[in-house]
From Swiss-Prot:
Pathway: Amino-acid biosynthesis; L-arginine biosynthesis; L-arginine from L-ornithine and carbamoyl phosphate: step 3/3. This is Argininosuccinate lyase. GO terms for biological process: arginine biosynthetic process via ornithine; L-arginine biosynthetic process. GO terms for cellular component: cytosol. Keywords: Amino-acid biosynthesis, Arginine biosynthesis, Cytoplasm, Lyase. It comes from the Bacteria. Disulfide bonds: none annotated. The gene is argH. One of its GO terms (molecular function) is argininosuccinate lyase activity. Its EC number is 4.3.2.1. It holds the Pfam family Lyase_1. PANTHER family: ARGININOSUCCINATE LYASE. Its main location: cytoplasm. It comes from Streptococcus sanguinis (strain SK36).
Length: 460
């Protein structure tokens, strides 16, 4: 049987259909089509300008590629599994378009540097889009924080009431996390913004190519300086998957809190109907499904990271077919992260905050216990002694069914003569929050300073 593959000259028989289907990647790498065409356009321009192929040949190939790009944008291109991948499909389509001269496009190029170039272009584009969506989410958080500087809520440790804080302070904690996520993707973009084109299969080429020219045409800031490295590593994808895993972990934590806060037991927020669903049997239900889905999708992103790490861990240099497994997880992670960022921004910007429920929650607990201990410490009592006294008072209140602010002054003064009538103001949630004006604290003045700093950061 004659083998019509572009690499078929060395073979006497063709792959069986089921084997061919197993080895094909066109079912998912079709997403690289516009980037493959971009890479080919840059490559053929370089071939023409350096005289490696004749000017009229370069012009014919360029015209054919531009027609394919128009057809792709119109949704008119059809791919064939028998052509394995996006690169061979494009070459087959180009041959149909312009004839045998299409075969000169692959001069001084391998599919190894071709696919690496495609993925660098694709990921560079997608990281830019993720950066924009992250910027939008951070702006949403800032807007919400500005509205709630003086909204008081319980702060938690171990999911137990710890100290009262400003809701804005809580939101700005996530703003900081997402800011670091933005920085990580910016570093990732730097590492992705290099051109592998011209590395060929693994050792470079005997043709006098101009790698700087193709890098410039494709908008890369530089080139890979080792041809083996250029075609054999996927650390730029691993870095993307790692950054995405950290980002979706942050999103998942925020989703967990939103899920808790909109429950009947908390009642701190209400999510918009547009981000909630109902039950097929319980008419009253309003479920935070979108938040739950983001939380759940963290697992698939983590899985893609560990999958590619496992693929890469034992690969000798240079290219191996195992690297075909680098794409599906990358594509799925891009989709998951972009949609999750959009959903999160939408949920936050449209939710309703129950300020009263948040405040009341801080008045029906012992989260002001630290205020009492600090009060005594500021009057000269060693903090450890103050801690012991307050702990016993909390135990006393717990048994009697009331709170620290309900203790009569006479009882306080039995415990310590240092306690005066001003203790009741010190125990108020708003006072407790306002006084925490240490740098980075939850005091209103500190929060307003942080908001101004964050605004300047976003404007850069």
């Amino acid at each position: 049987m004659v083998n019509h593959k572009l690499w078929g000259g060395r073979f006497e028989a063709s792959l069986e259909d089921w084997v061919e289907e197993f080895g094909a990647s066109i079912g998912f790498d079709y997403r690289l089509a516009p980037y493959d065409l971009q890479g080919s356009l840059a490559h053929v321009k370089m071939l023409g300008q350096t005289g490696i192929i004749a000017p009229e040949e370069a012009a014919a190939i360029q015209a054919g590629l531009e027609k394919l790009l128009v057809r792709y944008q119109a949704g008119e291109l059809e791919f064939d599994v028998r052509n394995e991948d996006i690169h061979m499909n494009m070459e087959a389509l180009l041959t149909e378009e312009i004839g045998p001269v299409a075969g000169k496009l692959h001069t001084a190029r391998s599919r190894n540097d071709q696919v690496a170039t495609d993925m660098h272009l694709y990921l560079k584009d997608q990281i830019g889009q993720i950066a924009d969506k992250l910027l939008n989410l951070r702006q949403v958080l800032l807007n919400l924080a500005e509205e709630h500087v003086e909204t008081i809520m319980p702060g938690y440790t171990h999911l137990q009431h710890a100290q009262p804080i400003s809701f804005a302070h809580h939101l700005l904690a996530y703003y900081q996390m997402f800011s670091r996520d933005s920085q990580r993707f910016a570093f990732n973009l730097e590492h992705t913004n290099l051109s592998p084109l011209g590395a060929a299969a693994l050792a470079g080429t005997t043709f006098s190519i101009d790698r700087e020219l193709t890098a410039d045409l494709l908008g890369f800031k530089g080139i890979y300086h080792n041809s083996l490295d250029a075609v054999s590593d996927r650390d730029f994808i691993l870095e993307f998957l790692s950054n995405s895993s950290i980002l979706i972990m942050h999103l998942s934590r925020l989703c967990e809190e939103l899920i808790n806060w909109c429950s009947y037991e908390y009642g701190f927020v209400s999510l918009s109907d547009t981000f909630s669903t109902g039950s097929s049997i319980m008419p009253q239900k309003k479920n935070p499904d979108m938040a739950e889905l983001i939380r759940g999708k963290s697992g698939r992103v983590y899985g893609h990271l560990f999958s590619l790490l496992t693929v890469m861990k034992s690969l000798p240099l240079a290219y191996n077919k195992d690297l075909q497994e680098d794409k599906e997880g990358m594509f799925d992670t891009v989709d998951t992260i972009q949609k999750s960022l959009d959903i999160m921004a939408g949920m936050l910007s449209s939710m309703t905050v129950n300020k009263e429920k948040m405040l009341v929650s801080t008045q029906q607990d012992f989260s002001n216990a630290t205020e009492l201990a600090d009060y005594l410490a500021k009057k000269g009592l060693p903090f450890r002694e103050a801690h012991e006294i307050v702990g016993k008072l909390v135990l006393e209140c717990s048994k009697a069914g009331y709170y620290l602010q309900d203790i009569p002054l006479s009882r306080y003064q039995e415990v310590s003569s240092l306690i005066e009538e001003d203790i009741y103001q010190a125990l108020e949630s708003q006072t407790a929050v306002q006084k925490r004006n240490s740098l980075g604290g939850t005091g209103f003045a500190q929060i307003r300073q942080e908001l101004e700093r964050a605004k300047r950061q976003l404007e850069k």
